[in-house]
Every structure is written in structure tokens, then in C-alpha cells.
Amino acid sequence: MNAIVENCPDKVLLADETRYGVLELQGRGVCKPADKTSSSNWMLAVAAKHDSMHPFIRFSALKSCSADDIGEALALLAGRIDTLVVDGYAGYVSLMDGILQGIKRQCRLVHARREVYAASTSGNLVKALLELSPEERVEHFRKNMRDGRNDVCLLAVLAGFQLIFGYEAEVAESLPDETEEAHAARILTHRQTFVKPVYEAIDAIFMEMAKTQTTQVKGRFRSKEDTQAAKAVRYWMNQREHLKVFLEDGRVPLETNTVERAIRPMAVLRKNKGFVQSIDGAKTLAMCMPLVETAKLNGIDVEELLNDMSKAAFKHAYEKQWTYWYTNEEAPKNPTRKIQDWANMAELLSDFNWADYLPWVWKARKEAEARLQAELAKQAAPQMA
């Protein structure tokens, strides 16, 4: 999977995490160590965007959700991407100042919308509005917006989000023969024209609400009261600078649906199984699951891909070892045994071209071979007749 990430040309990637217990790390089960290292373990997923020409999903087993553990898993991205789309977890802040320095962080706008939706539907306002006529609703909004009522302000914000996502849907699909760069430029122009004014209006409402709903401590906003409205305002104010990156880059999505969908099978497995016993088990799971999910994203048969890759890898190791045996007097007497020794396979495959078996490369090659076979069969048909 590292080869897939290293060879993916995408400059904007998505990340998400989900809990997955490892008993060995929690000091429980038959594999428990002498000391517990963490009471909560995680799986971190990194994926390409939904419209990427090089879709993939990569999992990493984490001892904890600390910035150090996440940073170790994401170190591979340093210097490879421009923007990472994540949630509002504070650990990502230190990463962008450290190991991922130079990479921009876009917080999911869809998460901000969820916070506002939860706050808007937690009271009786929606129920009361449904009992009013359209004219009475307009008057209700006009009066309460002037008074700065939180519930009405949040409904206005929710309407703004609906506009933003509606505008985004208008340019979501690329045009025929449109390049990725041209599509991103068209999206950016659309956002600057239509989305930015709405976003700025939403930001102005939150800035005003923050005066009564939050307090600032050491650069972070905290809720004054334990209410859904205060939580929504706090989330926006703390992530404010990282929610608007998409306004300057048409490649950056507003959501992370791809990685959330890809991580769902892991969550289902956790619900049914509960945990893995050992660290090795967690690493194996993190290695196998993304192979299947990446194959699904690329529309290919993972078994066929792995068979082709395994045959090519073994052939490479076999030919390399026998060539060494023929050309070196110090070679072992039985080179075949060394080929079958897994301890030496990594060395034998050190110069194997894994890039030929990237899902999108392998798929393109298979499609080209199928077209060639069809053309040859078409040419041979008249001769056989």
C-alpha cells in the first residue's frame, strides 16, 4: 500500500480515524504485555477524493489517537501533497506545524453543518415554525434575527449551508474531455462567485454569536453553557481558519465521503468482532482491508490483481537468484531454497517494479490487452469464414 500512496499523483487527500481495540496494547487478553500502553486504539484511513483518477484507501493501526502516532502514520505524505482534508481534531494542528509542515489543513465543512443541524433541531423552534404560514414565518425570522435569537440565527446558517452545497453540486461533474486542472479551475471560479459571499455571511453570524456563546482561553474558544448552539459556535470559531481553505483551491472537497465510506467496513467488523488480539493482528488487518477496498474503488478483481502481481514478483525473484548463482562462485548450492526463504524475499524484490501493479496502471493495461485481443479476433474472423 505504501507504493500506491507514493505513486499517487493527487495533491489533495482525505483522512479519517475510527476506534479499533487491540487487547495486547490495552494490557488484556492472552497476548498482554507487562505494561499497558493505551486504553483506546484506532485505525487511521487515508484516501483519494471521490473524483480522483487514482482512487485508493490506506489503513494504519494506531496505538492511540495522539498526534505522535497519527504523525508517524502520515509521515509518508510529507512533501507529496498540498492539502489534507480532516476533522477538527486538535492533534492535526501540531502536525501541520511539525512533520506535515507546509501542508494545508481543510476541516470538513460538512461537520460544521452537522453541528448546526443538531443545534437547530434540538429545541422546539422547528415544530413551532411548521405551525405558521409562510408569511408568518418570514415575519418571525425578521423579528428574531433583529433580536439575535440563537435558534433563528442557526436556521439562517443552515440555509446558508444548503446554498453552499447546492452551488457545489452545480459544478461537481466534469465536462466531456475536461482535464482535472480545468475542472478544478471552473470549480474555483464558481466558488469565488457564488459560494464565498454566502460563506462570509455565515462567518459573520458566527462571529456575532461567539460574543455571547463562547469565551476565549489561550487562543481556544470554549462554550459558556453546555448547549448545542454553544457547541456549534465553538466548533466554527476554533476551526475558522481551516474551514475556508476550499475557497482558494478548487481541488479541495467540502466533505470526506470517500474515506468515510471506505472506513465503514472496518467499523462494521469492529462492531461484530469487537477487537483484535495482538499488534501483529491489527497490522495485518490494516494491510489486507485496504487492498480489497482499493480494488472496489478501481472496479477491479482484487484476486486477479494479486495473482498477477504474485506471479510477476516470484518470477523476478527466481530469475534474479538464478542469475546470481550462475555468475557468482560464492552463490549457495541450492538457490531455489533461498528463493523460498521469506527472510530473503525482501532483498530479492528490492528492485521489483511495483508501479506496474498499481491498481489504475494494472487496470489500464488489462483494458488495453482486452481491446487488442478483441481487435485480433475481429481480424481473424473473416479468414476463418
Task: Please give the residue ranges for each predicted region.
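Catalytic center-proximal scaffold of phosphoryl-transfer enzymes
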Residues: 1-385
